[in-house]
Design a protein with these regions (language model features):
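Short, polar/acidic, helix-capping and beta-turn segments at strand->helix junctions
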Residues: 1-114
């Protein structure tokens, strides 16, 4: 049920916006924790669909309703996906509009086979 899109230029892959929907059912959990878990599942599926791995990701942008508290919610999944603190991608967290139905969204840039 993977539906993420993106763009490819040479070895660069730029994802489309990724939400916290469950990649299998397309349902959106109501809570931040569930959406964070699903966002990281979607990131992995998207980069693998492009022929890469999470090791190819060089930057992730997150938009969150409350970036100050949201960053803490990201940290556990971030450390699981990128366990080596010396080789993690750049990460930027920005404010998401208060009227957005999602707790967070993200996009990423990867360089695959470059």
């Amino acid at each position: 049920m993977h539906r993420q899109s993106g763009i490819r230029t040479n070895s660069s892959r730029l994802s489309g916006i990724i939400s916290g929907r469950d990649p299998q059912t397309s349902t959106m959990p109501p809570d931040l924790g569930g959406q964070v878990t699903n966002v990281f599942k979607q990131i992995k599926l998207c980069v693998e669909a492009a022929g890469g791995s999470v090791d190819d990701i060089i930057k992730v942008n997150f938009w969150m309703k409350d970036p100050a508290t949201g960053r803490a919610a990201l940290n556990g999944e971030w450390a699981k996906m990128f366990p080596d603190p010396d080789s993690r991608p750049a990460r930027h967290t920005l404010a998401l509009g208060a009227n957005n139905p999602n707790h967070l969204t993200c996009d990423f840039t990867a360089v695959i086979g470059g």
